Amino acid sequence: MNKAKITKENIVKLLTQSDSLEFEETQNEGSFNFTDFFTNNREKIQNMTTASCLSFLKNRQSIMRVIKSADFTFGSVTIKKTRNNSERVGVNDMTFRRLDAMVRVHLVGMIKDNGSALTEAINSLPSHPLIASYGLATTDLKSCVLGVLLGGSLPLISSVLNFEIAALVLAIYQDAKHVELGIDMSKFSTKEAVGKVCTVLKSKGYNMNSVEIGKAKQYADILKACSPKAKGLAAMDHYKEGLTSIYSMFNATIDFGKNDSI
């Protein structure tokens, strides 16, 4: 039996006629591949410097609110405001999540290739709210890579060559330490995130060999040294000297313990 393409007309035949109809299993014209998307759209953000990428990540939440409030255009690209999460997004459409992942991959490329860019990242990343709340020390290339990926779409990023194991280890860390990290599992399933990353890796034929496991251990050692803090506690740390002084006015002391909830 000849296999048919998945078209509107053939779907109608499948639903309304008694003739047997088998579709081509390999047809996947509508699937999304972030690696291809990044390659095809990278020139749209090629003028972003290390500083501008770092600023984007540091102010991500505020930038996202502005971009998602209405149709947002930069250059020839328009990020359309979607009315709800079920609204269809095409494989070539720019979304904030895809743009965010592109900026992160672009930044990692710069800090890997340029020593001054790496130094700039080492100096800037500790001031980023999410990195501060994780207690992640960004002192070298690998720790900076983790810092740049933190908060991004790990399933998208894991599809890019040489990002696989870093994205997977970070996803597993967030799942294993979701309580300490203060992640609300009703809003974000860390286990599901690990599954999505693994699905991407399996679909691209990623081989988790001994070399990759060795890289995983290096990333895991960096993350094991983190001292996660609740957001409120991270902010309190910023005012540590002043808070200590004010508490003393009431003959009291303050505990800046790493895992306290505020």
Swiss-Prot record:
Q: Which InterPro entries match?
A: Tospo_nucleocap
Keywords, sorted A to Z: Capsid protein, Helical capsid protein, Ribonucleoprotein, RNA-binding, Viral nucleoprotein, Virion
Output the superkingdom of the source species: Viruses
Its recorded name reads Nucleoprotein
Q: Name one GO cellular component term.
A: helical viral capsid
The record's subcellular location field reads:
Virion
Q: Gene that codes for this? A: N
Which GO molecular function annotations are given, in alphabetical order?
RNA binding
Similarity annotation: Belongs to the tospovirus nucleocapsid protein family.
